[in-house]
From Swiss-Prot:
GO annotation terms (biological process): endoplasmic reticulum to Golgi vesicle-mediated transport; Golgi localization; protein transport; retrograde vesicle-mediated transport, Golgi to endoplasmic reticulum
Gly residues biased stretches: 195-204
Name of the protein in question: Coatomer subunit delta-3
Membrane topology: Peripheral membrane protein
Xref: Pfam families: Adap_comp_sub
Function: The coatomer is a cytosolic protein complex that binds to dilysine motifs and reversibly associates with Golgi non-clathrin-coated vesicles, which further mediate biosynthetic protein transport from the ER, via the Golgi up to the trans Golgi network. Coatomer complex is required for budding from Golgi membranes, and is essential for the retrograde Golgi-to-ER transport of dilysine-tagged proteins.
Biased composition (Low complexity): 220-229
Bias kind Basic and acidic residues: ranges: 165-178
Keywords for the protein's UniProt record, in alphabetical order: Cytoplasm, Cytoplasmic vesicle, ER-Golgi transport, Golgi apparatus, Membrane, Protein transport, Transport
Subunit structure: Oligomeric complex that consists of at least the alpha, beta, beta', gamma, delta, epsilon and zeta subunits.
Length: 518
């Protein structure tokens, strides 16, 4: 008995996994596998088929064929026994009995074939033995990994305790109030928002509504200036943390892979934060939630906007904002409960119900107005993406094009196309922009840094092995822009007390929250 090759192929003859047990060129094995589907008659129940030189012993597995190529002198009964063994091994390693599942487990299947067949002859093994041989677990290796992992965990615990002590000491130093703003909170919605304490000349305009807000951990809103120069109690304890760092470096030098916690500490967050240069900053942001049908039409087009205010100095909190916006169909505003709604609806002025209470100050933004737009159609999309996959022979040709609206200049555009499981990157034939293949998630990312008047449209063309057209959906799109649909802006800031209007800056941005073609 001589098994020339053991293979898994599709019904069209596409080779997914193949292991040769004799010297055979790539061209010859490709020719033998491609010729097999033509030899198998439809409706026949045979388990083998012969040609002048070789014999095919096969077994259908859903939409695939498990195939043994042998010489004509081999024992057909032993060939069938080998085929049965391999058919039991495939479900043990492949997550699903289709092209994608087999390709994902290609190497595991090859190793299993090698354990089951040696030099073209079947080994006297069972499925359980093959699995054991492929795993090749080592008790010594497991013990070594457990010891090293325990050392790493112990080191991380020491580091966490030190970080906690440092953060606690910094928090204790920042407890003295400045102007009464003891706990600045980060609001997330209209229903309830709160900042406790009081500013000079009056109480803050926002009450304490705990269901809405959450405190910024370990971060005082306005620490006293003297605390900046205060020495950290027990600061010399950092030398112990330095020893733990040296221990981690020694582990890395021995080739150990150490997974550090990626969550930054509060100290790192504060050091990387760039404070605004102007005393008052207004941020206007709109988020897109769009679902476009691949055949045309929009199933969801939702825009949610927010106007947020950040004031650095307590004395600048007694102000009102004059705004204006474009008349957009379906635009609905909603103000914070402590904002004067009558003043906003009649004159488009954002001001507090009680003018004697200031807006809160600090490093956090306070949302004042929110809005929603829901009555736009497909013609208002900032970016339209069309995908045209077509199967030709053993390949799928995919053409993707985008068309951008004249209303927006889009920055950092990324179009992510899902692909079938591939051994190699797709063959990109033409592209306007850059591309990157994420092999881990099997996604092709098409990137354009800027879409403006010079490139309102563009295309991408690539090829992959034959696949179902639905494989390339849903397509995810991400981008940002410096103008918004509502075109809302603050035209002036009016002080409620004597003095000149404070200087302010304004930031407008349109971002994608969920933008897909399905």
């Amino acid at each position: 008995m001589v098994v020339l090759a053991a293979s898994i192929i599709s019904k069209s003859g596409k080779a997914l996994v193949s292991r040769q047990f004799v010297d055979m060129s790539r061209i010859r094995i490709d020719g033998l596998l491609a010729a097999f589907p033509k030899l198998v008659g439809s409706g026949k129940q045979h388990t083998y088929v012969e040609t002048e030189n070789v014999r095919y012993v096969y077994q259908p597995i859903e939409a695939l064929y498990l195939l043994l190529i042998t010489n004509k002198q081999s024992n057909i009964l032993e060939d069938l026994d080998t085929l049965r063994l391999l058919s039991k091994l495939i479900p043990e390693y492949a997550p699903s009995l289709d092209e994608e599942g087999v390709c994902k487990a290609a190497f595991e299947l090859l190793f299993a074939f090698i354990e089951a067949i040696s030099l073209g002859n079947k080994e006297n093994v069972t499925v359980a033995q093959v699995k054991q041989y492929c795993e090749m677990e080592s008790h010594e290796e497991k013990l070594h990994k457990l010891v090293m992992q325990s050392k790493i965990n112990e080191t991380k615990d020491v580091m966490r305790r030190k970080v906690t002590e440092i953060e606690k000491s910094k928090t204790d130093r920042g407890k003295p109030d400045k102007g009464g703003f003891g706990s600045l909170r980060t609001p997330n919605s209209f229903s309830d928002m709160g900042i406790r304490g009081g500013g000079p000349g009056g109480d803050p305009i926002f009450g304490d509504m705990d269901s809405f807000t959450h405190k910024a951990k370990g971060r005082p809103s306005a620490p006293a200036p003297a605390s900046a120069s205060t020495k950290v109690p027990g600061g010399m304890k950092l030398s112990k943390a330095q020893k733990t760092n040296q221990f981690l470096e020694s582990l890395k030098a021995e080739g150990e892979v150490i997974l550090e916690d990626t969550q930054p500490s509060a100290t790192q967050s504060r050091s990387s934060y760039i404070p605004p240069s102007d005393p008052i900053t207004v941020t206007i942001e709109e988020k897109l939630n769009v679902t476009v049908k691949r055949d045309g039409g929009v199933s969801n087009f939702d825009i949610q906007g927010t106007l947020a205010l950040q004031i650095l100095n307590d004395t600048d909190g007694f102000i009102q904002l004059q705004i204006e916006n474009q008349d957009v169909p379906g635009l609905n505003f909603k103000t914070h409960p402590n904002i004067n709604k009558e003043l906003f609806n009649s004159q488009q002025i954002v001001g507090a119900k009680d003018p004697n209470r200031p807006f809160p100050s600090g490093q956090n933004e306070t949302p004042l107005v929110k809005w929603r737009i829901q009555e736009l159609n497909e013609s208002s999309l900032p970016l339209a993406v069309n995908c045209w996959p077509s199967v030709s022979g053993n390949e799928t040709y995919v053409n993707i094009e985008y068309e951008a609206s004249e209303m927006f200049d889009l920055h950092n555009v990324v179009i992510s196309i899902p692909l079938p499981a591939l051994r190699e990157a797709p063959g990109v034939r033409q592209i306007d922009g850059e591309w990157r293949y994420d092999s881990r998630n099997s996604v092709l990312e098409w990137s354009i840094i800027l879409v403006d008047q010079s490139n309102r449209s563009g295309s991408l063309e690539f090829t992959v092995p034959a696949a179902d057209p639905s494989t390339f959906f849903p397509i995810s799109v991400g981008f940002s822009a410096s103008n918004t649909f509502s075109d809302l802006k603050v035209t002036a800031i009016r002080p409620l007390r004597e003095g000149s209007p404070p200087k302010f800056s304004q930031r407008n941005r349109l971002v994608t929250y969920n933008y897909q073609v399905v």
